[in-house]
From Swiss-Prot:
This is Growth/differentiation factor 2. One of its GO terms (molecular function) is cytokine activity. It comes from Homo sapiens. Disulfide bonds join C327-C393, C356-C426, C360-C428. Potent circulating inhibitor of angiogenesis. Signals through the type I activin receptor ACVRL1 but not other Alks. Signaling through SMAD1 in endothelial cells requires TGF-beta coreceptor endoglin/ENG. The gene is GDF2. Its main location: secreted.
Amino acid sequence: MCPGALWVALPLLSLLAGSLQGKPLQSWGRGSAGGNAHSPLGVPGGGLPEHTFNLKMFLENVKVDFLRSLNLSGVPSQDKTRVEPPQYMIDLYNRYTSDKSTTPASNIVRSFSMEDAISITATEDFPFQKHILLFNISIPRHEQITRAELRLYVSCQNHVDPSHDLKGSVVIYDVLDGTDAWDSATETKTFLVSQDIQDEGWETLEVSSAVKRWVRSDSTKSKNKLEVTVESHRKGCDTLDISVPPGSRNLPFFVVFSNDHSSGTKETRLELREMISHEQESVLKKLSKDGSTEAGESSHEEDTDGHVAAGSTLARRKRSAGAGSHCQKTSLRVNFEDIGWDSWIIAPKEYEAYECKGGCFFPLADDVTPTKHAIVQTLVHLKFPTKVGKACCVPTKLSPISVLYKDDMGVPTLKYHYEGMSVAECGCR
């Protein structure tokens, strides 16, 4: 077994150990008495006795590693996972995954629902609909916010004359900390943006400066409040307003775009280097420890001319070649429902992760891109087969996928190009 093969794709291949069986999580821990020759770690064919391996615990440990790579402390509670994400986030995910020609400006997108709203109804003396919207927005400080949008659904609440065109305006203010009064002085709020309204539907307003201020402020004091004023300019609609009552279908929400450069390709390359380094150290230790002993033992296999017995060597090669195919990339469909992660991973429901299977047999072909070390290890294995293992068939290049999930606070989060989730190339290392 090649230990490094596990490290290179965490949380990729090892977290999905049970998906090959296609069984629900609760049935995996029991297993079958006969085992499966193609089973992953810890079951017959995987290198450990079946009774010593707890697949449920294994998946739980890998889930912790997976969550850590997403900067999460845990999965959201059940009441938070039941809340449906905005359709906008699902549409955005579909656009990211279907259109390969475009590269988004930000690699992380989050949507934040409105926490509460305080409203005042328009009167003859005050012909505006006014709302203070409260949000709870939290962005890790190591991320760089590139854009923040407030999305409002504007509609006519009271049609007077359908023949008149709809016309109005929306004005947004950033309400400073500790300010709640409607008649507060202008210095307690900051103008952000105004926008003309000419039709019913979703409106997008850019409010990046407010969100950046909130993130910089003390989260225990900041209330993350916006004042929204809606005015109708035509007689056709007496009351133009946004959807804010509890239970409304189209409640306001925030979309925050940010970049996280703290992980990704660099981290994936580091994993690959660690894997190769581990394999090299393992073989060198074997050679230094057992080289002389093995040399003495192997002398009995030499003929009078001092050559390795051709018959035994050829037999070993045939046995090795018959043990399986050469190293190659094979299909591995991952279904998050099968491993019990579908409550917080929104999309994809499943994807093609691929895996590296097969042996690294002598002579190593060019298509497995062997390193010099892998070639040397393979030659040494022919000489000392009981002491030195063959080179390992492992991922040499990984590719990303986009993932839409709910973080530990239940916030729908889209991570574009989450690295290390699919095998692109396999090789002998």
